[in-house]
């Protein structure tokens, strides 16, 4: 591989070091940032994901507020937990772990989150704030991508950026972040309806792939020296019958790109660091 690897794990560790200092300053004011998690059911993957969030909290001094409900919890019970977190001054932000059991109204649950305590930054109100340029919690994965590029001195101002994928958690909000005046990139959002995807990616300085299609971006689709960010994560079964996770970027891209954000070890750690950042910022605002 000739591409320079942009290490999200190391960068996230730097951010956590900075957050520890900020959390200590808050403690001197008598404030302890608190992150809440709402977990309904006992799915092992969801439990592991939530446990990882609370390990991150412990690393930087953020308090953990766990709310766990059985799989058969009623809509009213879930609503009550969210109301409690919305009104709890010890909670500065929280997430609802998805997916929820099928009998629950996911959209209703997400919209019940107090937008100011929306640690994921994906509440409709906060996405609207992003569109309008108003302050508010920012979506964690897009924010993490921008922060990772910035901390590795990847020029964004005036850069031609192609984002592949128009999902509400990454693609759409990422385009909004990159076109803010503070970034000033020129963004093309590609998707399943895009004609001649390669023509777009070959013209780009930066290609960010968040489509959930393993190996979608290949080495012949980029210009030599381009920056490539792999956001995709898909579980596939290998020839040996064992499951593994793979990204949207073919390994051969590393021989052509100038810099590569890999999967794993790239965007994932940055997403988690930005979740903590959103909570600490909320505590700092009071």
UniProtKB/Swiss-Prot annotation:
Top-level taxonomic group: Bacteria
GO MF terms, alphabetically ordered: methenyltetrahydrofolate cyclohydrolase activity; methylenetetrahydrofolate dehydrogenase (NADP+) activity
One GO term of the biological process aspect: L-histidine biosynthetic process
Pathway recorded for this protein: One-carbon metabolism; tetrahydrofolate interconversion
Function: Catalyzes the oxidation of 5,10-methylenetetrahydrofolate to 5,10-methenyltetrahydrofolate and then the hydrolysis of 5,10-methenyltetrahydrofolate to 10-formyltetrahydrofolate.
Assembly mode: Homodimer.
Similarity section: Belongs to the tetrahydrofolate dehydrogenase/cyclohydrolase family.
Name of this protein: Bifunctional protein FolD 2
Species annotation: Salinispora tropica (strain ATCC BAA-916 / DSM 44818 / JCM 13857 / NBRC 105044 / CNB-440)
């Amino acid at each position: 591989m000739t591409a320079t690897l942009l290490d999200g794990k190391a960068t996230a560790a730097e951010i956590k070091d900075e957050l520890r200092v900020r959390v200590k300053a808050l403690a001197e004011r008598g404030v302890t940032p608190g992150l809440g998690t709402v977990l309904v059911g006992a799915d092992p993957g969801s439990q592991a994901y939530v446990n990882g969030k609370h390990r991150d909290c412990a690393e930087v001094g953020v308090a953990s507020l766990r709310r766990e409900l059985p799989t058969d919890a009623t809509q009213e019970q879930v609503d009550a937990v969210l109301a409690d977190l919305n009104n709890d001054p010890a909670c500065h932000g929280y997430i609802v772990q998805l997916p929820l059991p099928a009998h629950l109204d996911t959209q209703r649950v997400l919209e019940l989150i107090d937008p100011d305590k929306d640690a994921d930054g994906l509440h409709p109100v906060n996405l609207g704030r992003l569109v309008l340029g108003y302050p508010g919690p920012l979506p964690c994965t897009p924010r993490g991508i921008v922060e990772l590029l910035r901390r590795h001195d990847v020029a964004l101002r005036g850069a031609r950026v192609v984002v592949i994928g128009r999902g509400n958690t990454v693609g759409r909000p990422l385009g909004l972040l990159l076109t803010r005046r503070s970034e000033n990139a020129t963004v093309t959002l590609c998707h399943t309806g895009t004609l001649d995807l390669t023509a777009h990616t070959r013209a780009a300085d930066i290609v960010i792939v968040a489509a959930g299609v393993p190996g979608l971006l290949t080495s012949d689709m980029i210009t030599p020296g381009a920056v490539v960010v792999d956001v995709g994560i898909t579980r596939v079964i290998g020839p040996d019958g064992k499951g593994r996770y793979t990204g949207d970027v073919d390994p051969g891209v590393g021989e052509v790109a100038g810099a590569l954000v890999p999967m794993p070890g790239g965007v994932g750690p940055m997403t988690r660091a930005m979740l903590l950042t959103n909570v600490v910022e909320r505590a700092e605002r009071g």
